[in-house]
Amino acid sequence: MKRILLPLLLATVSLTSSAAGPLRIAILGDSYSTFEGYMSPAINELWYYPADSKRHNKANDVVSVEQTWWMQVTGRLGATLVQNNSYSGSTIAFQGYARQKEAANDGHSLRPGHPADYSPRSFIARAVNIGDSIGAPDLLLVFGGTNDSWAGTPVGDYQWGRWTRADLFTYRPALARLCRDLREMYPAMRVVFLINEGLRPEIVESTHVITKYYGYEYLNLSDIDKQGGHPSHKGMTSIADQVCKYLKGE
């Protein structure tokens, strides 16, 4: 496991908020961070469901929200979960998975076998909806890039501004745009990007370079047990262990 802590953020390592109350945490993620009844907005697509739900994937043993990595993290740190805006299948870039059939015009591609336009569910689109009536959280944990890697999203070029819509269908420009937006909208918020194991090397390297450029942190995760391609209860606990260890500076 590798990690980086940037000098710019050394003053924000404290696990209490600036108001001396509990640390306020938000999650921006994909299917790995979903659970029915805990997403905001509630219409987000999910992967994890309670054991008594007809939609629960019996191949995976995560059956309660208490088993999720993010609920374990907030519980162990005595933190407040401000919001979890995670969306199953979502990508950082606008490009999604290849179409299985012809679909309505989404402004990018119509033909089967061509990538779908995932811009409405993208991390960029959802980044504008972070926080609650009190304001932005103290800490945002961003857990994405997995679907970009699995969907074969092109990495594109390193680009730090003047992005066109076409640019945002590639990973590097999209991640840079996401980081820029977060920096402008929530300048005082600490942001840590969590990086799944087993991703394409160019996705991992790009995440390192771009998050560092914008003064954000990243944590490379490892040893995540999975069932059905998604963290099992054991895998969720492994993620929580690594995140808590990192946030505590251990």
Model features per residue range: what roles?
Residues 26-28, 140:
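Conserved beta-strand elements of the Class I
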Residues 36-37, 151:
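Short N-terminal helix/helix-N-cap motif within the alpha/beta-hydrolase-1
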Residues 42-156:
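Conserved SGNH/GDSL esterase-like catalytic core that processes O-acyl groups on lipids
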Residues 30-31, 146:
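Active-site metal-binding loops of divalent metal-dependent hydrolases
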Residues 29-30, 130:
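Active-site flanking residues adjacent to catalytic metal/cofactor-binding acidic residues
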Residues 21, 107-250:
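Alpha-helical cap/lid subdomain in secreted, periplasmic
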Residues 32-34, 235:
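Short active-site segment of divalent metal-dependent hydrolases/proteases
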Residues 5-18:
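Hydrophobic h-region of N-terminal signal peptides that target proteins for export
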